[in-house]
Swiss-Prot record:
Family recorded in the similarity comment: Belongs to the class-II aminoacyl-tRNA synthetase family.
Residues that bind Zn(2+): 366, 417, 544
One GO term describing the cellular component: cytoplasm
UniProt keywords, alphabetically: Aminoacyl-tRNA synthetase, ATP-binding, Cytoplasm, Ligase, Metal-binding, Nucleotide-binding, Protein biosynthesis, RNA-binding, tRNA-binding, Zinc
Its EC number(s): 6.1.1.3
Protein name, as recorded: Threonine--tRNA ligase
Gene: thrS
Any one GO molecular-function label of the UniProt entry: tRNA binding
Pfam families named in the record: HGTP_anticodon, tRNA-synt_2b, tRNA_SAD
GO annotation terms (biological process): threonyl-tRNA aminoacylation
SUPFAM superfamilies attached to this UniProt entry: Class II aaRS ABD-related, Class II aaRS and biotin synthetases, ThrRS/AlaRS common domain
Organism: Mycobacterium sp. (strain KMS)
Binding partners and assembly: Homodimer.
Amino acid sequence: MSTAASPAPAAPIRVAAGTTAGAAVRDAGLPGRGAPDAIVVVREADGRLRDLSWTPDADVEVVPVPADSEDGRSVIRHSAAHVLAQAVQDLFPEAKLGIGPPITDGFYYDFDVPRAFTPEDLEALEKKMRKIVKDGQLFERRVYESEEEARRELANEPYKLELVDDKSGDPEVMEVGGDELTAYDNLNPRTRERVWGDLCRGPHIPTTKYIPAFKLTRSSAAYWRGDQTNASLQRIYGTAWESQEALDRHLELIEEAQRRDHRKLGVELDLFSFPDELGSGLPVFHPKGGIVRKELEDYSRAKHLQAGYEFVNTPHITKEQLYVTSGHLEWYADGMFPAMHIDAEYDADGAVRKPGQNYYLKPMNCPMHHLIYRSRGRSYRELPLRLFEFGSVYRYEKSGVVHGLTRVRGMTQDDAHIYATREQMRDELTSLLQFVLDLLSDYGLDEYYLELSTKDPDKYVGSDEIWDEATETLREVAEASGLDLVPDPGGAAFYGPKISVQVKDALGRNWQMSTIQLDFNMPERFELEYTAADGSRQRPVLIHRALFGSIERFFGVLTEHYAGAFPAWLAPVQVVGIPVADAHIPYLEDVAAQLRSRGVRVEIDGSDDRMAKKIVNHTNQRVPFMLLAGDKDVAAGAVSFRFGDRTQINGVPRDEAVEAIVGWIVERRNTAPTADLVKAGAGT
């Protein structure tokens, strides 16, 4: 989830045949090493990035790529990964190299070493890296004449040897790709002798001095190529930026992100947990978390009813044939839990008397919704038919990628499937996108852009013509929204292209949230039909959509967005009464009863803690409204407000206090209440 902005694209420059891209950059007077916007590579018209040492055979127009752009940072981080690998092999000569790609906001490199890296190791490696950067080693591209030459050179690097034969197109495998097998050598800038090298397709910065700021952040175990049947390696993570200022901002952001980590807040606020007895990626929600979750669902349910959705419910398991028909077993089996073979009957000798059947936990709700549609004849007058379900699904995620609530194995989706005529398709998509954006805004998420995921040429069903029509329709609807639209080539599910809403949180991080998929294929596979106005039988168009993605993921994102301080309408405890002394508890109980009668969630703190301690405790629990009462308040029939920002309003008549609280909640304000805001709302 990248948070840094990219500059506007630079104007193109011309590189003359037989000269380097770097020379053209210098001749154009563009920024060089040391500037945050230093040009680090250039981009050809087809999007390919080239080193500044690249020499074209013919005159060519290229776009300079600065260090403070997304691509520029990616190149710097990839080069920093090489510097890390060199440092590791200098300090740990027995280390074997895995892969080392740039990733969002950083990079990593995997190593096969005898033991795990320690914090002291990372300090030593960082020191070694600083020396390599200071030396200004040159990055030089070298083309292997043959695979045999590469294998001879890499004979002592078993993981690199495996990559020589790699044809997967994995974007994290920076070692190979394109039509050439290449290495990047690090050269002594004075003697040009080779100091170190790595199998790599590039591109890279000109010298190590183009890495102005970096830091190693942590290490962990990681399976080779993410496959738990492979060797367990040690992965070192780091980050690199175009300036020390940018790095410092990023590290501050990391610190704040750690403070907001929903896994940490889930424990501190008693919202949810992940019991070992249940297994990885299977959360349980505690009573307070259950309240937040219910509020999320109830509001969504009400909005869907207003929008004309019809609620359905489907089971958690199904016979195998359903996912044969849908294509999931052919295209999505790796994401499904293993089959359960049940209903077999055996005789006394153990021989099968009646064969059983395979059942699966459902990874998606859509096939079951299609059965509901198909359960009787449908008329064009019924369309669009919008079926909605809070449906539980189960997906096999590798243990290494399971992460809190945002990547789980058991989840509940706010899943809808809309069956429409082709003539209704565009208007339905347009209104659906607006419905999604409005509902996200109601939860306080109102900064977003759109991403258009198109077909994976190796993993799709249906004709190219159908895919082209679906993709173009989604593109037109997305562009008409006025939001930024970013391409995601090959990112679609096997049955149709999709628009995803990428939401920006309070820290500026982007999260994939809602998805809208247009599908012409499933109606064919399930033989879905409706009777048209002319009496003919027609196929409906299918729209898949999930607004939250999953309830669990949305819960996790909101927890971090609000740092656990949920808006009052979502908060598990909306008001807490804090007496100055025990004698004031009955009075606060009366106020609490008044609030409860209006649907407000209230607690009274009658513990033995001192009042100051109680205020600290409930501030830490992110309770939006704290009501204090002492002798003067009781005598005046009033209460005093205390807020999380330490502001306070004293002596508010209790009826006014109740109305202020109820009004704040009913209006679903997503800002935290403060003394000034409550006074303004009450007109005082």
